Swiss-Prot record:
Gene Ontology, cellular component aspect: cytoplasm; microtubule
PROSITE patterns reported in the protein's UniProt record: FHA_DOMAIN
Keyword Cytoplasm: yes
Organism: Xenopus laevis
Polar residues composition-biased segments: 437-448, 470-495, 712-722, 1017-1040, 1048-1061, 1116-1128, 1146-1167, 1381-1390, 1562-1578
Family statement: Belongs to the CEP170 family.
This protein's name: Centrosomal protein of 170 kDa protein B
InterPro entries the record matches: Cent_Immune-Sig_Mod, CEP170_C, FHA_dom, SMAD_FHA_dom_sf
CDD domains (UniProt xref): FHA_Cep170B
Domain FHA, residue spans: 23-73
């Protein structure tokens, strides 16, 4: 056949073959090296377009450019080279003409030769200094592979190998012009004549070196190793290998030769097999001339001193030859690396055993997948294997499965493996062959499909010949083939790694395949363990084989296959063969281990020479650890892999690819694929036994690795393995799932868990505890939802176990049991029902993990099986109900054992539970929201409903399962609601107590644990959305979820502070409920407590809880949490239930508790924000209480008028400094729990008046807002409030975090929902109006005073306003979460006025809101917890919130207030504007003293922080803000004007003025937002002022506060 080769002929006549792949041209490390100084190190790239069969050159941005026909080509752009084009690189004196030559290559040569080797020989035309080319660069890797094969086939096949090599040489010679440089050792590589000569000499050399195939093979192996060497796995990633700078021609040239892939494939085996020696000597010589020293690479003496040496050593071990110096390996490994880089397909080509470099790649997974199924990439290794097997059957039948598997791996490797040198794909039976092929195969990557087959054929032929030499039957031949494959060093690297993965597949599939795979997989790093485990595994396998005597025919075949790779001597009996192989493997492993310690790494060097035992041990180790698989595994989620294991180890092992890629689906098929050509049953049986022993071993090993005894799962697995042998497929699948593959995946999963903690770990842990029965129950409950990810569910079922390493360990041992249990229950469950049952458990696991199809989830899933496994194991024979019961007990135990770990998870479980009860529709929202905690990406496959399961703790899962099985949904729901209420109360209390601190610590994002995604949104927005959009029932569920989330965030704090009390309280309540409900409650309690971390719900004492919880029935608690929260937000009238509560607990503490509970209930609905949680965690209950008290007193002045019904706590701010700190915009914005502080305050006030309910709805966080708002209005019984109110309040709650617009809508709803509330509100409004009138009078006074003090008030406005007011506004602004709402009186005022105006919001809320926003600048520090504060602050911050936040005041009151306030407001605006102008002028005048100005301003701002009296009237607040701003500005100006420029004097003046203001009862905003607003340019201030005056709202403050708030939120 004619082969076309392209050459670059230099002006000196040197001919450079252009490989059909990318090569680099440059001075260093390039395939075509030019010595001209005008040529860059990497000057240009010549790439081959296989579609168009043309070469293209691209200048790599070189300094001197690349010229085609004396025209410089643009940089970084491919230019097509045409025939006879004149190419010059830089100003090199040599120009190159593109020539095309066609060579006649015998068909035989093409068959037996890999793509022609590319040899670049450049003879410097002008001067050596300009061009110093390595004389020759020939990659005879394919020929070498052929030679290796021949060498392996020495003896009976020596002649045939020689002939093949000769053919290869011919081919190489012929191909030289056609693109292939002659194989190494060929005499003439450059021209057609050289190629022809090469064909002759190659043949003669082949004949010559047929005698010394070792040298040739070693040399080629080294070359191949260099090419496919794992040293530069990264390089392998690259399209080209720069490392092989030694080679002028990239190894991939071989891969791209015109010759058919067959030739390439054969060359690959040649490389791996030492049978190719005939070509090797010339190659050696060629290498002598090349930088790569191939002279030492003679068959018996691999002299390649490159990295290949190590792989070659492996080859030698396989072939019984010792590789030459490692030095040779390096050169060739460079070649191999270069080839791999140049040929991505080569990179993928590395056989599974060759995945040394892909330890973290997907190769292992793919290898497993390749075993018996299609690859995820879509390749079908089995189908490929059959093709290879057919040609190879000529050599030996035993080789067929091996080669088939090899090819399976090969496509997988080619597709997935980025390793350059694993061209040959070793079958699970003969991974070594694959490795040897892998090198050349990488070269021949373009014809991946054909090449693998050809290579497999060649390998099998060689292997068969070699086996015959060894005088063994087909099995023996398989072993030699494997050895030959393993000969190549570089492939071995990838193969060893890939082997591990492949071995995992193989372990399930025929033992023969498994053993080689194992050796490769485990050889390197795990060689010793691999040996030990291999021996054990072999023995176990032998026993299994005996047990599987019923399938002796197939088993003997696999056994023989295994035996042959293990030792050349064939062992007839499988049992004997297996032990022998293990011994041999151990020896081989030892040898390879020595070699394995090469730079490539232990795994890298290990190859086909290792004994079966070693391979098996490695495979088992890999399975147990999932070390190799995880990397590749990462692509193919461990979940996918895992489910396969669960479904059937056989599937996983036998059809590794399908297992990996479609673990669930391939459940029924694995047995057949396992056989790869063997009978399905025998293979299944065999894999089953193998799997059983392997599983056992794996489980044992996993338990050791994870510090958990896997004995129980192991023995169950074994017993089930043995016991289920009769049920071959199902049993084996189960066994595989349970014992070997399962532990393997779990191990990997565990390893992955640390990697995936954010997404998978938490979900996994939660899933983990759900028992199999729980899974089944969940399945029944959630099966419809889980239908989406049935397969994934299967995977996740096991994966769930993997969440924490500890759980994963336990789960692993239990996992095997679980799988066994499941199989005992129904083997069909795994196959048919697995998708049904497991999808449910997976609903939790997959949904939680969102793993669905992703295989990573298997890691999590494994954890789920952990606990489930143990339960299932014990109840393997039990019905699902029994299992459920057992699981319940197990859960109960777990609750005790894992309570700490499970706490957050338990909460989620409860949430999930409620969600489930409420319906799957709700589940998605809640789950998704919980997912924010888990940060589980809503996996494509996982529905939002599933997400909560992911986040749900295993115990919670169990509880959920128990609930469904025991119908605890009602009781549990009540308990959960009760718990939530208690937690909400605790949170509210803590919130209020630590609200200020939390505001200060706004940055605290502990809510991350709850929802990494949602800082403020998830708690408030989600709950509001759900409440607003969903029915109350769903709202309640969402509330539960929110509460759970909150509690989960605060749970850590609760645990720290009151965990025991919270849990005890929950437990006590739950005790009344059935045990299952109790269990769930416990888990929830734990979870909530834990999740409540910073929330502060723990702040509530048991007494408080008891006092508050009893007041609200459990059912009432949940619904009332939402409803109360909403109603509190919505209206100020007392709900009857709330009134009753207040009445029953009139004591300040009792009331506080109740209000806290009520608010906390609403609060718990939106889980605590990170900020609030963090603050609570820092400050604790006392801090929150203190804040609440201080805030209360601070707020009360404003609240006294604002909260007319409330006692109007002391008007003077108790802790302005603390409030200021809390009001800091960053902290405030960051912690949306700030409202909780103000809410706490209002709850405290609510003691006096039970009106805390409505305030909550105004605050960003309803609970928080309520806490502050209740003071304004007597707390109406939460029960009294209508669900619509609750919803609207929830809506308001969300809007408070989002916007006041939501509030307005919620206000409207509230208004509609209850006119009684409106009436009450009207009364309150009237009271507030009166209070506002008083405040207005005070403001007028203040205005006058301020006008007098304008001169003394100074520019400190900027700093002070920005720091304090804008902070509080930022805290309040758009994220009116509890933390965001300032604790300052202004917030209270706004909330109060807002609450009053809410019913009327439709009419005038906008104006009021606008006023409030301006005022809110001053009151941003006010805790957002109070509804009034929220409205005030938010209105100041967000005019959109204003409509909803504006109190539903009587129109008359509003008008009256406006009339009263407008003049004052205008006056204050005028003063403020004038002051602003004056300040600016003063700044200009004192520009030189700008520094002093800033300092003085800062000092004054810090010293002049006087909280403005909290006023329900937002306009009043804005006026006060403006006046205070003016005051500060004047103070700054005075300080500046003062020649001394003494800020202290100014500060004293300021203090005096503030004292006057205080004496005048001027509410001063502790917030610096007003000052900050003032700090803005006067123009802005004026604009805002005018706007606010027109709208009777202080937009400037609001806008500034909004900005600040947004900034801080970010």
């Amino acid at each position: 056949m004619s082969v076309t080769s392209w050459f670059l002929v230099s002006s000196s006549g040197t001919r450079h073959r252009l490989p059909r792949e990318m090569i680099f041209v440059g001075r260093e490390d390039c395939e075509l090296m030019l010595r001209s100084r005008s040529v860059d190190k990497q000057h240009a790239v010549i790439n081959y377009d296989s579609d168009k069969d043309e070469h293209r050159v691209k200048d790599l941005g070189s300094l001197n450019g690349t010229f085609i026909n004396d025209v410089r080509i643009p940089d970084q752009k491919y230019i097509t080279l045409k025939l006879n084009d004149n190419i010059r690189f830089g100003y090199d004196i040599n120009t190159y003409v593109l020539e095309q030559i066609q060579h006649q290559v015998p068909e035989e040569a093409l068959k037996y030769c890999d793509p022609p080797v590319i040899a670049f020989e450049q003879i410097p035309a002008s001067s050596d200094k300009h061009e110093k080319y390595t004389s020759h660069l020939q990659m005879c890797s394919k020929t070498s592979a052929v030679r290796e094969d021949q060498f392996k086939e020495q003896g009976a096949h020596m002649d045939s190998s020689q002939a093949k090599q000769e053919k290869v040489d011919k081919k190489s010679a012929t191909d030289v012009p056609a693109y292939r440089t002659p194989l190494y050792g060929q005499p003439s590589w450059w021209g057609e004549d050289d190629d022809n000569k090469l064909g002759k000499e190659g043949r003669s050399q082949d004949e010559h070196y047929s005698e010394r195939p070792k040298d040739m093979t070693q040399h080629e192996e080294e070359v191949s190793d260099n090419m496919g060497y794992r040293d530069s796995p990264d390089q392998c990633m690259y399209p080209f290998r720069r490392e092989p700078s030694y080679f002028e021609i990239p190894t991939k040239d071989f891969q791209q030769p015109v010759k058919p892939p067959e030739t390439q494939v054969y060359e690959i085996p040649t490389k791996d097999t030492d049978t190719v020696p005939p070509v090797t000597p010339p190659v050696m010589q060629s290498h002598a001339s090349f930088t790569i020293e191939f002279d030492d690479c003679k068959p018996g003496k691999i002299k390649i001193k490159d990295h290949v040496t190590k792989p070659s050593m492996r080859q030698r071990k396989t072939a019984g030859k010792e590789p030459g110096p490692t030095e040779m390996v390096s050169a060739e490994s460079k070649v191999a690396d270069w080839l791999v880089h140049n040929d991505p397909s080569l990179i993928r080509r590395p056989s599974p055993g060759e995945d040394v470099y892909s330890t973290k790649s997907d190769l292992p997974i793919h290898n497993r997948t390749l075993k018996g199924n299609k690859h995820e990439d879509g390749t079908q290794s089995d189908s490929e294997d059959p093709l290879v097997t057919k040609p190879e059957q000529e050599t030996g039948t035993a080789d067929h499965p091996q080669h088939q598997r090899q090819f399976n791996r090969e496509p997988e490797e080619l597709l997935h493996s980025q390793q350059a040198f694993v061209i040959e794909f070793f079958d699970d039976d003969a991974p070594r062959k694959k490795r040897s092929q892998s090198f050349t195969h990488n070269s021949n990557s373009p014809p991946n499909d054909t090449d693998p087959i050809l290579k497999a054929k060649v390998d099998k032929r060689k292997g068969t010949v070699h086996v015959e030499k060894v005088s063994t039957n087909g099995t023996g031949s398989t072993a030699p083939a494997s050895k030959s494959l393993s000969s190549p060093s570089f492939p071995q690297r990838s193969n060893s790694f890939r082997r591990e993965k492949t071995e995992d597949r193989i372990a399930s599939t025929p033992i023969t395949a498994r053993l080689p795979g194992k050796n490769y997989g485990s050889v390197g790093k795990k060689s010793k363990l691999a040996q030990e485990f291999a021996a054990e595994y072999m023995h176990e396998q032998a026993e299994v084989v005996k047990q599987a005597a019923e399938k002796p025919m197939t088993l003997p075949l696999s056994a023989s296959i295994l035996q042959q790779p293990a030792s050349q001597v064939q062992i007839s009996s499988q049992v004997q063969a297996m032990p022998v192989t293990s011994d041999v493997r151990s020896e081989t492993i030892k040898n390879e281990e020595e070699d394995n310690l090469s730079d490539a790494g232990t795994y890298t060097i290990e190859t086909e020479t290792q004994d079966r035992e070693v391979e098996q041990a490695r495979k088992m180790i890999d399975q147990v650890f999932g070390v190799f698989e995880p990397d590749e595994y990462s692509k193919i989620s461990s979940t996918v892999y895992r489910p396969v294991i669960n479904k059937g180890k056989e599937e996983h092992l036998g059809s590794e690819p399908s297992m990996t890629h479609k673990p669930i689906m391939s459940l029924s098929t694995p047995p057949i694929k396992l056989s790869n050509g063997l009978q399905a049953e025998p293979l299944i049986e065999r894999p089953g036994s193998s799997s059983k022993s392997g599983q056992k071993w794996v489980s044992r090993w996993a338990s050791l690795a994870d510090s958990y005894p896997d004995a129980s799962p192991t023995s169950p697995s074994d017993s089930q393995k043995q016991g289920f042998i009769a049920d071959d497929e199902d049993v084996i699948e189960r066994i595989e799932v349970q014992g070997e593959a399962d532990p393997t995946v779990p191990s990997r999963t565990r390893r992955l868990l640390p990697q995936l903690p954010p997404e998978n770990v938490m979900p996994t842990i939660f899933v983990c505890q759900e028992s199999f029965s729980a899974e089944s129950q969940r399945k029944h409950v959630e099966e419809p939802e889980k239908g989406i990810s049935a397969e994934n569910s299967s995977l996740l079922l096991v994966q769930e176990e993997l969440d924490p390493d500890s759980l994963s360990d336990t789960s692993r041992s239990d996992d095997g049991v679980l799988s066994v249990r499941k199989s005992a229950k129904a083997s069909k469950i795994y196959r048919n029902g697995w998708k049904g049952e497991e999808p449910h458990s997976r609903e939790s696991s997959v949904q939680r993990t969102l793993v669905s199809s992703s295989e990573k989830k298997s890691t999590c899933f494994y954890v789920g099986n952990d606990d489930m496994g143990s339960l299932k194991q014990t109840t393997s024979g039990l019905s699902s109900k029994d299992v459920v019961k057992n699981h319940e007990s197990h859960i109960n135990l777990k609750a005790n054992v894992h309570s700490n770990v499970e706490t957050p998870s338990a909460e989620r479980l409860v949430n999930q539970f409620h969600k489930k009860e409420n319906g799957s529709a709700k589940d998605p929202l809640s789950f998704v929201r919980q997912e924010s905690f888990t940060k589980e990406k809503s996996s494509s496959n996982v529905s939002p409903n599933k997400l909560p399961h992911i986040s749900t703790h295993p115990l919670l899962k169990d509880l959920s399962v128990t609930k469904s099985s025991h119908d605890y949904s009602q009781e549990t729901r009540l308990i959960l609601k009760e718990t939530e209420t208690a937690l909400a109360a605790l949170e509210a209390k803590l919130f209020t107590q630590s609200h200020l601190d939390e505001l200060e610590n706004t940055p605290s994002l502990r809510d991350d644990s709850l929802s990494g995604e949602s800082d403020v949104d998830t708690a408030s927005t989600v709950s509001l959305v759900s409440d607003k959009n969903a029915p109350i029932h769903s709202q309640q569920n969402r509330i539960v979820n929110l509460q759970k989330e909150k509690s989960s965030s605060t749970s850590s704090i609760q645990e720290q502070y009151c965990q025991s009390s919270a849990r005890e309280r929950l437990s006590e309540k739950r005790r009344t409920v059935p045990a299952d409900a109790g269990t769930r409650s416990i888990t929830k309690r734990v979870g909530m407590t834990r999740s409540t971390g910073a929330r502060g719900s723990l702040d509530f004492t048991d007494e408080e809880r008891s006092s508050s919880l009893p007041y609200m029935p459990v059912s009432e608690t949940v619904s009332s949490d939402y409803e109360n929260s909403s109603s509190r937000h919505i209206s100020r009238r007392k709900p009857i239930g709330q009134t009753c509560k207040e009445d029953s607990s009139r004591s300040s503490n009792a009331q506080k508790v109740q209000q806290a509970l009520t608010r906390s209930n609403s609060l718990s609905t939106p889980r605590p924000t990170r900020a609030s949680k963090l603050r609570r965690a820092r400050l604790g209950e006392s801090s929150d209480n203190e804040c609440a008290d201080g805030e209360r007193s601070n707020i009360s002045p404003g609240t006294s008028s604002a909260n007319s019904s409330s006692a109007k706590s002391s008007t003077e701010p108790k802790k302005p400094s603390r409030l200021d700190i809390l009001a800091m915009p960053r902290k405030r914005a960051g912690s949306f729990n700030v409202p909780s502080d103000s809410e706490t305050y209002s709850s405290v006030k609510a003691m006096f008046s039970g009106r805390s309910v409505d305030q909550t709805y105004t605050s960003r966080k309803p609970a928080v807002a309520e806490s502050k708002q209740p003071p304004k209005k007597p707390v109406a019984p939460t029960q009294k409030q209508t669900p619509s109110k609750a919803r609207s309040s929830s809506v308001k709650y969300s809007s408070s975090s989002t916007t006041q617009t939501s509030r307005s809508s919620s206000v409207s709803r509230h208004h509609k929902s209850s006119r009684q509330d409106e009436d009450e509100v009207e009364q309150e409004v009237y009271n507030n109006f009166m209070a506002q009138s008083v405040e207005i009078a005070e403001i007028a006074r203040l205005s006058q005073t301020l006008v007098k003090d304008v001169a003394s008030l100074a520019r400190e406005i900027h700093d002070v306003a920005g720091d304090g007011d804008s902070q509080s506004s930022s805290g309040t602004g758009q994220s009116t979460s509890i933390s965001s709402v300032p604790n300052t009186p202004a917030s209270t005022i706004s909330a109060r006025e807002e609450t009053i105006k809410r019913p009327l919001q439709r009419t005038r809320p906008l104006q009021l809101v606008h006023h409030i926003p301006e005022a809110s600048l001053n009151y941003q520090k006010i805790p957002p917890g109070s509804t009034g504060l929220e409205d005030f602050d938010q209105n100041m911050n967000d005019s959109r919130e204003d409509p909803s936040k504006r109190r539903a005041r009587n129109i008359e009151e509003v008008i009256f207030d406006n009339l009263m306030l407008n003049p004052v407001s205008q006056l204050s605006h005028t003063i403020c504007s004038d002051t602003e102008v004056l300040t600016e002028k003063m700044k200009v005048l004192f520009q030189n003293t700008e520094k002093n100005w800033e300092e003085i301003e800062a000092k004054i701002n810090s010293e002049n922080e006087v909280p403005i009296l909290k006023t329900s009237n937002k306009e009043i607040s804005s006026i006060l803000k403006e006046l205070r701003r003016v005051q500060k500005q004047l103070e700054v100006i005075n300080a500046i004007i003062d020649r001394s420029g003494n800020p202290e004097d100014t500060a004293s003046n300021k203090k005096t003025s503030s004292t006057l203001l205080t004496s005048n009862a001027l509410p001063r905003t502790t917030n610096n937002s007003a000052a900050r607003t003032q700090s803005q340019t006067p123009g802005h201030l004026r604009n805002y002022i005018h706007k606010s005056s027109s709208s009777s709202s202080r937009s400037p403050g609001s806008s500034f506060s909004r900005d600040d708030e947004e900034t801080y939120i970010v």
